[in-house]
Swiss-Prot record:
Keywords: ATP synthesis, CF(0), Chloroplast, Hydrogen ion transport, Ion transport, Membrane, Plastid, Thylakoid, Transmembrane, Transmembrane helix, Transport. This is ATP synthase subunit a, chloroplastic. It comes from the Eukaryota. GO terms for cellular component: chloroplast thylakoid membrane; plasma membrane; proton-transporting ATP synthase complex. PANTHER family: ATP SYNTHASE SUBUNIT A, CHLOROPLASTIC. Belongs to the ATPase A chain family. It is found in: Plastid, Chloroplast thylakoid membrane. F-type ATPases have 2 components, CF(1) - the catalytic core - and CF(0) - the membrane proton channel. CF(1) has five subunits: alpha(3), beta(3), gamma(1), delta(1), epsilon(1). CF(0) has four main subunits: a, b, b' and c. Pfam families: ATP-synt_A (PF00119). HAMAP family: ATP_synth_a_bact. The gene is atpI.
């Protein structure tokens, strides 16, 4: 009963975290729901960039790839390698999920450094990278959790839950809490790094607007890419772990 209570409290904590606000926000009222407009707007822009780029790159595929097609094939091979390394031989069906996570986070992170979100005026708050908002990172982390539970149950059925008493039943509470704390670590790592990067750039621009921010922005682009890779790699590792049933 105590374990169940702890798990429920952890899930409730994740729900409460999704309501955390940093600064002012702009909302839309749709029916009886309050929608976070800033995150939706910037997420739609990121999705449009991804869909537009992919469409332009593969609208006229060539036997010998050139330019955009060559770049996207390289990205696909990179994602396949990451998925195969972490998941194993059954990685194929998970490449679209891992690739979607990686590309969305990567473009979202870079949009925070390259796109002039601040020049777009809103009634309240301001636009920023989607991953600069805790609501986005928690949603991505919860999707990852659903994915690795689905992977484990699909592969092993109800026998998947046997891992919680391995190597000894004494570890049952710890093993259960481990699965519910994975989304916390994923979401806070991504949110904290992207928010900190944007805050550092804003502070330096206000202090030394012409010189110092440039190398810091390049460093931000590098760390943004690394954060996308870390998230995708951990997501693939969690899925592979749930299918293999070991820690």
């Amino acid at each position: 009963m105590n374990v169940l209570s702890c798990s429920i409290n952890t899930l409730k904590g994740l729900y409460d975290i999704s309501g955390v606000e940093v600064g002012q926000h702009f909302y839309w009222q749709i029916g009886g729901f309050q929608v976070h407009a800033q995150v939706l707007i910037t997420s739609w822009v990121v999705i449009a960039i991804l869909l537009g780029s992919a469409t332009l790159a593969v609208r006229n595929p060539q036997t010998i790839p050139t330019d955009g097609q060559n770049f996207f094939e390289y990205v696909l091979e990179f994602i396949r390698d990451v998925s195969k390394t972490q998941i194993g031989e059954e990685y194929g069906s998970w490449v679209p999920f891992i690739g979607t996570m990686f590309l969305f986070i990567f473009v979202s992170n870079w949009s925070g450094a390259l796109l002039p979100w601040k020049i777009i005026q809103l009634p309240h708050g301001e636009l920023a990278a989607p991953t600069n908002d805790i609501n986005t990172t928690v949603a991505l982390a919860l999707l990852t959790s659903v994915a690795y539970f689905y992977a484990g149950l699909t592969k092993k059925g109800l026998g998947y839950f046997g891992k919680y008493i391995q190597p000894t039943p004494i570890l049952l509470p710890i093993n259960i809490l481990e699965d519910f704390t994975k989304p916390l670590s994923l979401s806070f790592r991504l949110f904290g790094n992207i928010l900190a990067d944007e805050l550092v750039v804003v502070v330096l621009v206000s202090l030394v607007p012409s010189i110092v921010p440039i190398p810091v922005m390049f460093l931000g682009l590098f760390t943004s890419g690394i954060q996308a890779l870390i998230f995708a790699t951990l997501a693939a590792a969690y899925i592979g772990e749930s299918m293999e049933g070991h820690h």
